[in-house]
Amino acid sequence: MREGRMFAQKLSYKEVLDSEGREMGVLYNIVVDAKTGILTELVIKPASELDTSGFKKENDYILIPFDAVKSVRDVIVLDSEKIKTRA
């Protein structure tokens, strides 16, 4: 596989942290715009201690805009400023 590419399957169940190191939860799924193919949201199973009141929710999951992703390595890191109160 070429440098800089990753299969979505490898992302499932990766730990998700904010840029300050706080645990957000675990990646459950990814939402893709069917017309454009653009990744739009991460579907995250929130950590039990995470206050989810400021997040857009669907069932037991929080939805995070894909543009909040800072990096993907062993964990997924989100930009703390881009995820604040986006319910």
What do these predicted regions represent?
Residues 1-87:
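Peripheral interaction segments used for macromolecular assembly
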